Every structure is written in C-alpha cells, then in structure tokens.
C-alpha cells in the first residue's frame, strides 16, 4: 500500500489558530489539516522530526501517504506545504484524501 506512514493527533477547537499553532511549533510539532472526500476536514498535529524524515524523499509528494489519527487511518496525498522562509522547516501541511 503506502510507503509512508505518519502518526498524527487530532487537534481540538481550542488548539487551532495563530497562537495555538505557534505554541505547537515551539514544541516541535507541525499543524496540518486533512480535507476532501465526503468526510469533514480534520485538524491534526504531526511530529516535526517524522515529517522532515518523510520529506527527504521526492516520492512523498507523488505517492499516497497513510496518516494514523488515533485508531483511524486516512489515505491522503500532500496538497500544500508551507515552510519557514529562513529555516526551511515545515510550518503547516495540507493533505487531501485520496
């Protein structure tokens, strides 16, 4: 199936927004969203180290990725990735359901 498997945690409503995202980034976490298909969008948090490791491969941008959110598995493709302008570290990721 997918070569890339990422573990994520769902974010509550109070953990969304500019200030909350900044706090997550200070803890080496990356805010992300999963959308598309018939299901509602899901705000998730990924570990920075795990995402950077996956980004080292160019295939990550072309293949279907599995994201485990709790006990649920989402098959997604990366839609957009925002990086820090100076550090080049991921700041936010958008995933679209496949």
Curated annotation (Swiss-Prot):
Residues of the region (Disordered) are 1-23
Calcium keyword on record: no
What's the superkingdom here?
Answer: Bacteria
Which InterPro entries does this UniProt record tie to the protein? Rbsml_bL25/Gln-tRNA_synth_N, Ribosomal_bL25/Gln-tRNA_synth, Ribosomal_bL25_short, Ribosomal_L25_dom, Ribosomal_uL5_bac-type
Name the SUPFAM superfamilies on file. Ribosomal protein L25-like
- Keyword rRNA-binding carried by entry: yes
A biological process from GO: translation
Key words, A-Z? Ribonucleoprotein, Ribosomal protein, RNA-binding, rRNA-binding
Q: Which GO terms describe its molecular function?
A: 5S rRNA binding; structural constituent of ribosome
Coiled-coil annotation: which residues?
none
- A cellular component term, taken from the record's GO annotations: cytosolic large ribosomal subunit
Q: List, alphabetically, the Pfam families matched.
A: Ribosomal_L25p (PF01386)
Q: Which PANTHER family match?
A: RIBOSOMAL PROTEIN L25/GLN-TRNA SYNTHETASE, ANTI-CODON-BINDING DOMAIN-CONTAINING PROTEIN, RIBOSOMAL PROTEIN L25_GLN-TRNA SYNTHETASE, ANTI-CODON-BINDING DOMAIN-CONTAINING PROTEIN
Family membership: Belongs to the bacterial ribosomal protein bL25 family.
Q: Which purpose does this protein serve, as stated in its record? A: This is one of the proteins that binds to the 5S RNA in the ribosome where it forms part of the central protuberance.
Q: What assembly does the database describe for this protein? A: Part of the 50S ribosomal subunit; part of the 5S rRNA/L5/L18/L25 subcomplex. Contacts the 5S rRNA. Binds to the 5S rRNA independently of L5 and L18.
The protein's name is Large ribosomal subunit protein bL25
Gene (UniProt): rplY
């Amino acid at each position: 199936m997918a070569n890339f498997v990422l573990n994520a945690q769902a974010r509550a409503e109070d953990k969304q927004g500019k200030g909350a995202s900044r706090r997550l980034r200070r803890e080496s976490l990356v805010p992300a969203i999963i959308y598309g298909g018939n299901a509602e969008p899901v705000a998730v948090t990924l570990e920075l180290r795990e995402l950077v490791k996956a980004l080292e491969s160019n295939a990550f941008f072309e293949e279907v990725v599995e994201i485990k959110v709790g006990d649920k598995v989402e098959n997604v493709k990366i839609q957009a990735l925002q990086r820090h302008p100076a550090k080049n570290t991921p700041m936010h990721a958008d995933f679209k359901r496949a």
